[in-house]
Curated annotation (Swiss-Prot):
Disulfide topology: C288-C300
Biological classification of the source: Eukaryota, Metazoa, Chordata, Craniata, Vertebrata
Region feature (Disordered): 56-75
Keywords: Disulfide bond, Glycoprotein, Golgi apparatus, Membrane, Signal-anchor, Transferase, Transmembrane, Transmembrane helix
Transmembrane segments: 32-49
Cytoplasmic side: 1-31
Gene designation: Hs3st6
Name of the featured protein: Heparan sulfate glucosamine 3-O-sulfotransferase 6
Keyword Zinc attributed: no
Species this protein is from: Mus musculus
Xref: PANTHER family: HEPARAN SULFATE GLUCOSAMINE 3-O-SULFOTRANSFERASE 6, HEPARAN SULFATE SULFOTRANSFERASE
The protein's Enzyme Commission number: 2.8.2.23
């Protein structure tokens, strides 16, 4: 009986211990879940767009030229594909960069041209979705008639190591457009976008530098994207400089018609989009499109464009300007253009 009592007492102790441990674990779950939630939100908004799910899986082989009156019906939900006459082709021109440089504005301005057909959403094919295959990619494109240009824009291509080789594999004749902007203001704009979606981030200064105002942290993507010369070096291994057009993000704001005119020349298009299509919106501090014939009102980019930047201490700005200066000068030499950032 004594042995039986001893076993009974042991079972009671274990049951009590198990209850205590369960209570402690439940108490830890709430803050742990909150941490996981915040980290997930940061990753969602700080990383480039994710690969959209495919409607059906195409054969992973390069796609031959599409015969007339046929089309691939493979596409991703959420990426609208225009219907109608014509056929789907691989893009002859790509806006490959850079994030927060003005790529969305340029794409919307170019879409005014009757000979430009462009995918509105960013497919992220050459950086995140390449395993879907070229047939899948072509199936996303809008239909075009002979003489029209197919385009898409994904700004993260410019900083993706594998993108130049992959694009060259699709077509070595692809024309490449890079919209660049002062890398300091670009980084602040990048941070402002992430902060608007993920409140509670560390300060810009804390992310840009190690140990206060120590070395610049080039591991942070907002800083790394602005090393334009380094990224261009990678692209020039596959494409000659003549295949590139570098658009000034600053001039795209101050003189949109002039910059869009250069792009139309580069694409071999007639200058259809001119200053008559633009007006400057003083509230947004950004050019908007005048209303087209039959349209009810002028069209500006979304509310996320032209958002106010957080205040960044002048010492931080000056340190970053000094850091970028040699990279900027090399970029000027490589492109033959002085963008006036120094």
């Amino acid at each position: 009986m004594a042995g039986s009592g001893g076993l009974g007492g042991g079972a009671g102790d274990l049951q009590g211990a198990g209850t205590g441990q369960g209570t402690a674990l439940r108490a830890l779950r709430a803050p742990l879940a909150l941490v996981v939630l915040l980290l997930s939100a940061y990753c969602l908004f700080a990383l480039p767009g994710r690969c959209p799910p495919a409607a059906r899986a195409p054969a992973p082989v390069p796609a031959p030229a599409e015969p007339p009156h046929t089309s691939l019906r493979l596409r991703a939900p959420g990426l609208p594909v225009a219907s109608g006459p014509g056929r789907r082709r691989f893009p002859q021109a790509l806006i490959v960069g850079v994030k927060k440089g003005g790529t969305r504005a340029l794409l919307e301005f170019l879409r005014l041209h009757p000979d430009v057909r462009a995918l509105g959403s960013e497919p992220h094919f050459f950086d995140r979705c390449y395993d879907r295959g070229l047939a899948w990619y072509r199936g996303l494109m809008p239909r075009t008639l002979d003489g029209q240009i197919t385009m898409e824009k994904t700004p993260s291509y410019f900083v993706t190591q594998e993108a130049p080789r992959r694009i060259h594999g699709m077509s070595p004749d692809t024309k490449l457009i890079v919209v660049v902007r002062n890398p300091v203001t670009r980084a602040i704009s990048d941070y402002a976008q992430t902060l608007s979606k993920t409140p509670g981030l560390p300060s810009f200064r804390a992310l840009a530098f190690r140990h206060g105002l120590g070395p610049v942290d080039t591991a942070w993507s907002a800083v790394r994207i602005g090393l334009y010369a380094q990224h261009l070096d990678n692209w020039l291994r596959y494409f000659p400089l003549s295949h590139f057009l570098f658009v000034s993000g600053e001039r795209l704001v101050s003189d949109p018609a002039g910059e869009v005119g250069r792009v139309q020349d580069f694409l071999g298009l007639k200058r259809v989009v001119t200053d008559k299509h633009f007006y400057f919106n003083a509230t947004k501090g950004f050019p908007c499109l005048k209303k087209a014939q039959g349209s009810g009102r002028p069209r500006c980019l979304g509310k996320s464009k032209g958002r106010p930047h957080p205040r960044v201490p002048e010492a931080v700005v000056q340190r970053l300007q000094a850091f970028y200066r040699p990279f900027n000068r090399k970029f000027y030499q490589m492109t033959g253009q002085d963008f006036g950032w120094d």
